[in-house]
Every structure is written in structure tokens, then in C-alpha cells.
């Protein structure tokens, strides 16, 4: 699991390789990632928009941005959490993702909450140190 806290928002990411959805012989590798956003501050926060950089093993980067996540712009109360799962296909067997959420506090102040960088690796390709 990958985790980062900034501006009173803790973001945790857990990626999973989807072997059944992937077709390596066709250059299609698919991951699901589950994100939990926790409000550690004293005011409600609302997720307004997202920005992603998705980089494959060849160094090709795709920028993705849009309003909300999975069709929602959730309001997260102090101490509350919001969790969702989404997916990312790549043409290579590994890569990484990074990004941020545009958030708005209850008082109207906007800020960027950093999503921790996380790697997309097939379990069979991970290197293990002995």
C-alpha cells in the first residue's frame, strides 16, 4: 500500500494486477487500484477534480484529468473516509501513476491533495531481494 498525507487529507492506494483482464500477447496489461481518502482535518472537504500522470515502462506518459471520481464529487466529513476502485490499462507490463485531487474545504478554500506515486507491476515481474 502507498500512502501520503497533505493539507489534512490522507490518501492510500492499493494497486492490483488483473491477470484475467490482461492479454499480454496483445500488449494489454490491466490494473485496478483502490483509493481511500481520509479527512484528517477539522472541516469537511469535497473532492472536485482529479489529475493523473500514467507512465508506462517505455516512458510514455498520458495525462488524464476530469471532474470528480467514478462520477462523484464526494463530501468527506472530518474523520470520514471515501473509498473507490478504478482501473488503468497499459501497453507494457509495468509502469507507475501519480497525481492529485483538487479539494475544497467547507470554508471554500481550494487546495491540491497529493496522490502518492505508485507502481504498476505484475506479481511475476517483481524483483525480490534476498
Curated annotation (Swiss-Prot):
It holds the Pfam family DUF525. The lineage of its organism: Bacteria, Pseudomonadati, Pseudomonadota, Alphaproteobacteria, Maricaulales. Residues 3-127 form the ApaG domain. This is Protein ApaG. Disulfide bonds: none annotated. NCBIfam families: PRK05461.1. The gene is apaG. It comes from the Bacteria.
